[in-house]
Amino acid sequence: MILNSSTEDGIKRIQDDCPKAGRHNYIFIMIPTLYSIIFVVGIFGNSLVVIVIYFYMKLKTVASVFLLNLALADLCFLLTLPLWAVYTAMEYRWPFGNYLCKIASASVSFNLYASVFLLTCLSIDRYLAIVHPMKSRLRRTMLVAKVTCIIIWLLAGLASLPTIIHRNVFFIENTNITVCAFHYESQNSTLPVGLGLTKNILGFLFPFLIILTSYTLIWKTLKKAYEIQKNKPRKDDIFKIILAIVLFFFFSWVPHQIFTFMDVLIQLGLIRDCKIEDIVDTAMPITICLAYFNNCLNPLFYGFLGKKFKKYFLQLLKYIPPKAKSHSNLSTKMSTLSYRPSENGNSSTKKPAPCIEVE
């Protein structure tokens, strides 16, 4: 917990009554190394995703719009990652000034909300494409997808405004270091509680429930299709993919959300045990690595569910340029069905059930 604040030379001076919390030599070595790996892999992977979707696939489907924006949001975050690597390697000493502190912190917050919102919209799009293919044709347009992405970027920016306002550079007097951090006055609990609950609920709980519901309904629809076509072999890999998508999202973000909430309790003074604070401050950067590394892999993960994405991705790696006139589209592995149950749940029994194809 931080207390006893004063201002001098434009930098707020504060006291930290748990100055050793989270400060371990292995953290100062391991975390910058992980950040560096995430930076290299993320920049390389997401840049290739942008090139494949925009230049090879020509951005012709709703899913491709969401994946392109997902990759762009990740790239915005990744560009600030070297700052955090240096910050951690310097034992949490921030040398870049107040403006970069705000920008880098806002980038982290922005990526969290933008990525989660885009993944949620992608799950809704898959639900509409598979469960309600006929009814959703007028809704699943490129214009709607682009407008949705604009709204998502605006909402993510709005959700990041408190970070820009309240994240600052502070000088901790009893450790003689300058940090980039949030600082809450103990008598004002509205701000930290609001930020923490917003991150937990808007940044995880609601999106996870929507994603879980969407893919559960997709699961049921595909299962019903396989039951009708009893003479066709069931492709269990589709169901494994659905399960992997839900579990991938859940386990990527749950640890970070838990320790974020505990950190808010510490800032409010509700947790005053330095041992617990040490656990939280030590675990926080590790959960950040887990969450954001998986986040940066999402465009590749979702993209490789489509056969055409894999085809063009390999072409790019072989330096094969895109064709001048391309009519390719992005279809995730669950987006195209040659057989679809009718919207009211009834299916014709006069004709043999056609083969189900999932790309």
From Swiss-Prot:
It comes from Bos taurus. Interacts with MAS1. Interacts with ARRB1. Interacts with FLNA (via filamin repeat 21); increases PKA-mediated phosphorylation of FLNA. C-terminal Ser or Thr residues may be phosphorylated. Residues 336-350 have a biased composition (Polar residues). Belongs to the G-protein coupled receptor 1 family. Coiled coil: none annotated. It is a multi-pass membrane protein. It comes from the Eukaryota. This is Type-1 angiotensin II receptor. The chain crosses the membrane at residues 26-55, 62-89, 99-125, 142-165, 191-216, 240-268, 279-304. It is found in: Cell membrane. A lipid is attached at C355 (S-palmitoyl cysteine). Residues 336-359 are annotated as: Disordered.
